Regions:
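Conserved structural position within tetratricopeptide repeats
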Residues: 24-27, 58-61, 95
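Position-specific recognition of the canonical hydrophobic site in helix A of tetratricopeptide repeat
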Residues: 9-10, 44, 78
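Canonical tetratricopeptide repeat
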Residues: 3, 38, 72, 105-109
Length: 115
């Protein structure tokens, strides 16, 4: 459920169905950081930034050493004007040895922020 919902979220398709799948997975496994991240990320991708923040904060609590989850939280912080916290999360994500593609994206955000 979560995998398909997250994949759809990343592709920007079937977002209503994706959210339903992810919420179902989150209800079944509320302590799974990856599923919690997916829920926060679908909220972010559908411009519900303030709603996404506490969920992504929880995801980071559950999976503190995951670069992608820290990056997602940084993005959400930026969108709700919490820029210092966003920069902190992005810098933290960089220290977790993300793959080259993610590292490059984060470095751009550190230089220019998000649009």
């Amino acid at each position: 459920m979560n995998y398909l919902g997250y994949a759809w979220t990343e592709q920007g398709i079937n977002l209503t169905k994706a959210e339903k799948l992810i919420r179902k997975a989150a209800n079944l496994r509320p302590k799974d950081g990856y599923i919690t991240d997916s829920l926060g990320w679908i909220l972010y991708q559908t411009a519900r930034f303030a709603e996404a923040v506490p969920i992504l904060e929880r995801a980071v609590q559950l999976r503190p050493n995951d670069a992608i989850i820290n990056d997602h939280l940084g993005d959400a912080y930026w969108k709700v004007e919490r820029h210092l916290e966003a920069v902190y999360q992005w810098r933290r994500a960089i220290t977790m040895n993300p793959d080259a593609e993610l590292k490059e994206k984060i470095e751009k955000k550190l230089s220019f922020g998000l649009k």
